[in-house]
A protein has these predicted regions:
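N-terminal targeting leaders
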Residues: 2-7, 12-15, 20-192
Length: 192
């Protein structure tokens, strides 16, 4: 009886902690599945994460102007710059700074010379991104894990390592999603 009570007490004490472990295991498995389904190698996937982190650090250190909002997205060494900067000169400086990184193969500089985006506009962009991703999940012609979706000021940018057919299907899905003003493909094609 004492053993049963001790076991029950231990279970009650450890139960909440074990739930966290399950989330870590499940989350780790889901993340592993995403990487396994990605066309990039694990090394390239990690390099892309490093590019995004290093670029963000460089931008925050080198460009301290108020009103700047720069996002860096990397996919297979192709870098997409989105957001707002105060001048054309800074737009070019940001590109030059990021182009100096050894892991960067190509840059799509889509920075806008404009004031910083409002929170309402950012929320709208997040909703558009979610809608496009949801629609891609339900599209047979596109493996949604192969396409990265970024939205800035109602413009949807699509990146990925895809066939021409997958690219066109993804573009069609994004273009017909509510709230999308324009679609800009930045794909690397697997079927040259």
């Amino acid at each position: 009886m004492k053993k049963s009570l001790a076991s029950l007490a231990l279970l009650l004490l450890l139960g909440p902690g074990l739930q966290g472990c399950a989330a870590v295991v499940v989350g780790g498995a889901a993340g592993g599945a995403m990487v396994a389904n990605d066309k990039r190698t694990l090394g390239t996937y990690i390099n892309d994460q490093e590019v995004e982190l290093k670029a963000a650090r460089r931008i925050s250190q080198d460009f301290t102007q108020a009103g700047m909002n720069v996002s860096v997205t990397s996919f297979n060494g192709w870098v997409l710059l989105t957001g707002q900067v105060p001048s054309d000169a800074i737009k070019q400086q940001v590109q030059t700074d990021i182009a100096g990184m050894s892991e960067v193969r190509q840059i799509f500089n889509e920075l806008q010379v404009a004031g910083k985006q409002s929170l309402a506009s950012e929320a709208n962009d997040a909703a558009i991104t979610a809608a496009v991703k949801t629609r891609l999940i339900n599209t047979r012609d596109v493996n949604f894990d192969h396409v990265k979706v970024v939205t800035q000021s109602n413009v949807v940018y699509l990146m990925g390592l895809v066939s021409h057919q997958e690219a066109q299907s993804a573009i069609d899905v994004a273009a017909t999603t509510s709230g999308v003003a324009k679609v800009v493909p930045a794909f690397e094609y697997t079927d040259q």
